[in-house]
Protein backbone atom coordinates (compact mmCIF):
# COMPACT_ATOMS: atom_id res chain seq x y z
CA UNK A 1 0.00 0.00 0.00
CA UNK A 2 1.25 3.45 -0.81
CA UNK A 3 -0.45 5.15 2.10
CA UNK A 4 -2.38 7.49 -0.18
CA UNK A 5 -6.13 7.68 0.43
CA UNK A 6 -8.25 5.70 -2.02
CA UNK A 7 -5.35 3.49 -3.18
CA UNK A 8 -6.33 0.28 -1.39
CA UNK A 9 -8.32 -2.48 -3.02
CA UNK A 10 -10.27 -5.03 -1.09
CA UNK A 11 -11.43 -8.40 -2.43
CA UNK A 12 -15.16 -9.00 -2.11
CA UNK A 13 -16.16 -10.97 0.97
CA UNK A 14 -16.57 -14.72 0.27
CA UNK A 15 -20.34 -14.51 0.73
CA UNK A 16 -20.52 -12.17 -2.29
CA UNK A 17 -19.12 -14.82 -4.64
CA UNK A 18 -22.10 -16.14 -6.58
CA UNK A 19 -23.03 -19.67 -5.46
CA UNK A 20 -22.34 -22.26 -8.12
CA UNK A 21 -19.93 -20.06 -10.07
CA UNK A 22 -17.09 -22.16 -11.44
CA UNK A 23 -19.37 -25.20 -11.74
CA UNK A 24 -20.27 -26.33 -15.25
CA UNK A 25 -23.14 -28.69 -16.00
CA UNK A 26 -23.75 -30.47 -19.30
CA UNK A 27 -27.08 -32.25 -19.79
CA UNK A 28 -27.36 -34.55 -22.79
CA UNK A 29 -30.93 -35.62 -23.53
CA UNK A 30 -33.06 -37.35 -26.16
CA UNK A 31 -35.25 -34.70 -27.80
CA UNK A 32 -37.50 -37.10 -29.79
CA UNK A 33 -38.21 -38.89 -26.48
CA UNK A 34 -39.77 -35.67 -25.12
CA UNK A 35 -37.07 -35.12 -22.47
CA UNK A 36 -36.57 -31.43 -23.27
CA UNK A 37 -39.33 -30.43 -20.83
CA UNK A 38 -37.60 -32.40 -18.06
CA UNK A 39 -34.29 -30.69 -18.91
CA UNK A 40 -35.90 -27.22 -18.83
CA UNK A 41 -37.61 -27.95 -15.50
CA UNK A 42 -34.36 -29.20 -13.96
CA UNK A 43 -32.30 -26.33 -15.42
CA UNK A 44 -34.79 -23.80 -14.03
CA UNK A 45 -34.61 -25.32 -10.53
CA UNK A 46 -30.80 -25.34 -10.64
CA UNK A 47 -30.61 -21.71 -11.88
CA UNK A 48 -32.99 -20.64 -9.11
CA UNK A 49 -30.69 -22.16 -6.49
CA UNK A 50 -27.39 -21.32 -8.25
CA UNK A 51 -27.83 -18.27 -10.52
CA UNK A 52 -24.13 -18.17 -11.47
CA UNK A 53 -23.96 -21.73 -12.73
CA UNK A 54 -23.20 -22.60 -16.35
CA UNK A 55 -25.61 -25.13 -17.88
CA UNK A 56 -25.22 -26.50 -21.39
CA UNK A 57 -27.63 -28.82 -23.17
CA UNK A 58 -26.77 -31.27 -25.92
CA UNK A 59 -28.92 -33.59 -27.97
CA UNK A 60 -28.22 -37.19 -27.06
CA UNK A 61 -29.08 -40.66 -28.26
CA UNK A 62 -32.34 -42.53 -27.82
CA UNK A 63 -33.41 -42.64 -24.17
CA UNK A 64 -30.51 -40.49 -22.97
CA UNK A 65 -30.66 -38.08 -20.06
CA UNK A 66 -27.05 -37.82 -18.90
CA UNK A 67 -25.68 -35.16 -16.54
CA UNK A 68 -22.03 -34.17 -16.18
CA UNK A 69 -20.71 -31.78 -13.55
CA UNK A 70 -17.29 -30.33 -14.37
CA UNK A 71 -16.73 -33.13 -16.89
CA UNK A 72 -17.68 -35.99 -14.54
CA UNK A 73 -20.75 -38.11 -15.31
CA UNK A 74 -22.94 -37.90 -12.20
CA UNK A 75 -26.24 -39.21 -13.56
CA UNK A 76 -27.26 -41.54 -16.39
CA UNK A 77 -30.87 -42.35 -17.26
CA UNK A 78 -29.50 -45.10 -19.50
CA UNK A 79 -28.08 -46.74 -16.36
CA UNK A 80 -30.82 -45.85 -13.85
CA UNK A 81 -33.95 -45.96 -16.00
CA UNK A 82 -35.43 -42.75 -14.55
CA UNK A 83 -34.72 -39.07 -14.00
CA UNK A 84 -32.76 -37.51 -11.13
CA UNK A 85 -34.49 -35.86 -8.21
CA UNK A 86 -33.82 -32.11 -8.09
CA UNK A 87 -32.59 -32.33 -4.50
CA UNK A 88 -29.94 -34.90 -5.45
CA UNK A 89 -28.65 -32.75 -8.32
CA UNK A 90 -28.64 -29.62 -6.12
CA UNK A 91 -26.62 -31.54 -3.51
CA UNK A 92 -24.11 -32.69 -6.16
CA UNK A 93 -23.72 -29.08 -7.34
CA UNK A 94 -23.19 -27.92 -3.74
CA UNK A 95 -20.47 -30.55 -3.35
CA UNK A 96 -18.82 -29.51 -6.63
CA UNK A 97 -18.86 -25.82 -5.70
CA UNK A 98 -17.19 -26.68 -2.38
CA UNK A 99 -14.52 -28.75 -4.13
CA UNK A 100 -15.79 -32.00 -2.59
CA UNK A 101 -15.66 -35.39 -4.30
CA UNK A 102 -18.64 -36.10 -6.54
CA UNK A 103 -20.50 -39.38 -6.35
CA UNK A 104 -22.83 -40.77 -8.98
CA UNK A 105 -26.52 -40.11 -8.37
CA UNK A 106 -28.18 -43.53 -8.30
CA UNK A 107 -31.58 -42.51 -6.91
CA UNK A 108 -34.08 -41.79 -9.69
CA UNK A 109 -37.75 -41.09 -10.22
CA UNK A 110 -39.74 -43.04 -12.81
CA UNK A 111 -39.75 -41.58 -16.34
CA UNK A 112 -43.56 -41.46 -16.47
CA UNK A 113 -46.64 -42.00 -14.38
CA UNK A 114 -49.68 -43.84 -15.68
CA UNK A 115 -52.88 -42.51 -14.15
From Swiss-Prot:
Give each disulfide bond as a residue pair: 30-33
Protein name as annotated:
Migration and invasion enhancer 1
Reading the lineage from the top rank, the first entry is Eukaryota
According to its UniProt entry, the function of this protein is described as:
Increases cell migration by inducing filopodia formation at the leading edge of migrating cells. Plays a role in regulation of apoptosis, possibly through control of CASP3. May be involved in a redox-related process.
Keyword RNA-binding belongs to the record:
no
Lipidation positions, renumbered (S-geranylgeranyl cysteine): 112
Q: Which residues form the propeptide?
A: 113-115
What the entry lists under NCBIfam families is as follows:
CXXU_selWTH (TIGR02174)
Family (UniProt): Belongs to the SelWTH family.
Give the UniProt record's GO annotations in the biological process aspect: apoptotic process; negative regulation of apoptotic process; positive regulation of cell migration; positive regulation of filopodium assembly
Q: In which tissues is it expressed?
A: Among normal tissues, present only in Leydig cells. Strongly up-regulated in breast cancers and in brain cancer distant metastasis (at protein level). Up-regulated in prostate cancer cells and in the higher grades of prostate adenocarcinoma (at protein level).
InterPro entries xrefs: Selenoprotein_Rdx-typ (IPR011893), SelW_related (IPR051441), Thioredoxin-like_sf (IPR036249)
Tell me which Gene3D superfamilies the record gives: Glutaredoxin
Record keywords: Acetylation, Apoptosis, Cell membrane, Cytoplasm, Disulfide bond, Lipoprotein, Membrane, Prenylation, Redox-active center
Amino acid sequence: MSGEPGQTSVAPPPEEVEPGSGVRIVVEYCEPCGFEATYLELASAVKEQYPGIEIESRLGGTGAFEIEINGQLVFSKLENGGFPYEKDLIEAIRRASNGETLEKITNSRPPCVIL
